[in-house]
Design a protein with these regions (language model features):
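Short, well-ordered beta-strand segments in beta-rich or mixed alpha/beta enzyme
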Residues: 2-9, 38-67
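N-terminal first-folded block
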Residues: 2-32, 36-37
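Short alpha-helical
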Residues: 13, 24, 46-48, 70
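Generic "edge-of-domain/loop-turn" microfeature
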Residues: 13-15, 46, 62, 96-97
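An amphipathic, aromatic/His-enriched active-site/gating alpha helix that lines ligand/cofactor pockets
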Residues: 24-36, 56-90
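Glycine-rich beta-strand-turn "strand-cap" elements at beta-sheet edges
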Residues: 40-49, 76-102
Length: 102
């Protein structure tokens, strides 16, 4: 399994636009990317203006497939418009145990 956890500081007044984009990205992943196992958008109550993105893929090849789709190609454009800062990008490269293990 391959994945990442990303912390996004959202620009003031841009939360709805960012969430619309991330929901679209999740819909595309669900409809067209069988190797995308998780594409979750979270918020932590005590951190207003912060969104967490958790992604889990079958393997690196599945992430590479995700990167070929339209939402991924628009990431930089959306980031410029809606994100103050992207921090704590934590690559998760080797799953040690998972409920998805076969």
């Amino acid at each position: 399994m391959y994945g990442m956890l990303t912390k996004i500081l959202v620009k003031s007044g841009k939360r709805s636009e960012l969430l619309d984009y991330l929901r679209w990205d999740a819909e595309v992943a669900r409809a067209t990317e069988p190797g995308t196992w998780r594409f979750d958008v979270w918020e932590a109550g005590p951190e207003p203006g912060v969104v967490y993105l958790y992604e889990a893929y079958k393997d690196r090849a599945a992430f590479d497939d995700h990167a070929k789709h339209e939402p991924y190609k628009k990431w930089d454009e959306i980031a410029d418009k809606t994100m103050e800062q992207v921090t704590d990008v934590i690559p998760l490269t080797d799953s040690l145990a998972s409920n998805l293990d076969e």
